[in-house]
Amino acid sequence: HDFRISDRWSPLSEKRPLRPETRYIILHTTEGATEGALAKIQRYGEAHYLVAVSGEVYRIVDQKKIATHAGRSMWEGRSPIDNYSIGIEVVGYHDQDLTEAQYAALRELLRQLKGRYRIKDQDILSHCMVAYGRPNQFHPEEHRGRKRCGMLFSRPEVRKRLGLSAGPRRDPDVEAGRLAVADQELYQHLYAQAGAATVPDKLAAAQARPEAPKPAVEAMVIAKGVNAWSIARERYAKPTT
């Protein structure tokens, strides 16, 4: 596979400030197709790179500048993560595998960025690891579980194919008591294979988010075990929701 980067600069790239330091790479899934995702990300400067299904890589925001890709986010007490990271959007879904072309392209892109910024494998993270939510009526504390974006990038077999060693063994902000856990299912997915399969009792949110029913259409209907917050997540209580 020939590694190619095409420029699709955001009109906001030139206006963005330089990033004070680069500690992390954050991997996202678009949860939609290339055309719509690229248009939105380009318009708002929401990632440095996008990797299409074909393996084409698009450069959107200057890698030395801040891209607004992580939203409300924290890792190791640092917040927002936009100020410390490079954001890569990968076209696809958090629970579906990448194409062979995407694996090849993303692996090479990560290899180059790791070398340039001396980023350790442990600091290449899924968006869902660093995102957090504000207190709301379902979860009285600031909490993990706001998103499942990029969830597949925590899987050991996926990381191996990307040339990465295992991800973090624990959530530093949960362990330090800075954040509670709202989505125990997600927490277990991210950290179970590292020996942290259970949420620390003293830090768990009062009510764990129940497992979403299948199929997906049913997951959008309020019913027993499916409340408004579990559907709307970060959009809950917004006037547009």
Predicted regions and their residues:
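Basic/polar, cationic surfaces and motifs that engage anionic cell-wall
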Residues: 1, 93-210
